[in-house]
């Protein structure tokens, strides 16, 4: 907290990891400044962060909150940022995070708000040497900015939410995110540059799979796009909400929902999301809506006349999404929760975006279930389940949807569960009754 790297050492003002893995749980990293890469964290080895908060970390180079450094030609580890909060971080590229060398990464259940870059990317994903896989799932990007200055090559500038310059064979899976109210601009001598393509999601190279997202209401000084720009391989999309056809540089699928213009979509988003409209721009409101970090509440389930709770269960299969939504490497599972840890509906009424409409933080629909057959209490390191009836297939899930404890059938009465091996964090218990 409050570190400076501006002398002989210019990187990693908060934490400098020079090779060993960095595993951070529930750590606050704030108010660090560096003249080099990575004001909050500089990681030359593996970086795994869960439940951390990165606030006001400022780099004069790349990676305000964190910078991952890797120049090898073969991948030995993956990066994972899970359930973290990034706000008011600044850098040239990657105000929240900069992945260099390669971008085999899992970014899930995070919130990125009010970060600013002067070149590209709140999250900047880089590495063209070989193919990698990156998944962004159940994240919220709101009120982030790119403020670029016109130069020789302006096409590579952008990504007020996500910037990607990857190997052409690298997959970038963007799944069930809410990306709203972000701004990208590029001026030269006070005039918007004509060759600027800056968008909220800016893919300079790579193979994108874009499913189930709200990517709308994002502004840009570009005359070409504002929500999504893709100069990489053809994008595969489905069940997204976009501002309009002229605000995306991709071909939408039949299941994608589009507004008629950015201005019109901002009004529709203002009706759908907890937000304010200020001078014609949407400013989503973040709050603790039942999860461990701030999210944007869906207050109405319609984008204009289009319902947003239309996702079939098949739309959460990893094989379709081409993304590792539960951070287990293998593409054989499915997305189970929203960003808060609320269980998603499987009856064809799940919601587009990071927030499952109509469900509270417990994952129980408030209008249909008012009591639970299971009560819990903890006496470290034992969690006690007290059930009035036999429970079937009792599981405890992490926030990423991975099963961390599988109890199977549990009899009525009190059942002790040893949770000493679990990291501190938020977990969800799911059970079934006859």
Placement of each model-derived feature along the sequence:
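Beta-strand/loop edge motif enriched in small/polar residues
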Residues: 1-14, 31-33
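Predominantly extracellular beta-rich ligand-binding scaffolds that present long acidic/polar faces
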Residues: 9, 15, 21-26, 41-52, ...
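Short coil/loop residues immediately preceding or within conserved phosphate-binding loops
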Residues: 12, 159, 198, 331-332, ...
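A short acidic/small-residue loop/turn micro-motif
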Residues: 250, 345-353, 408-413
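Surface beta-loop-beta hairpin patches that serve as ligand-binding interfaces in beta-rich domains
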Residues: 305-362
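C-terminal outer-membrane/trafficking sorting elements
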Residues: 365-432
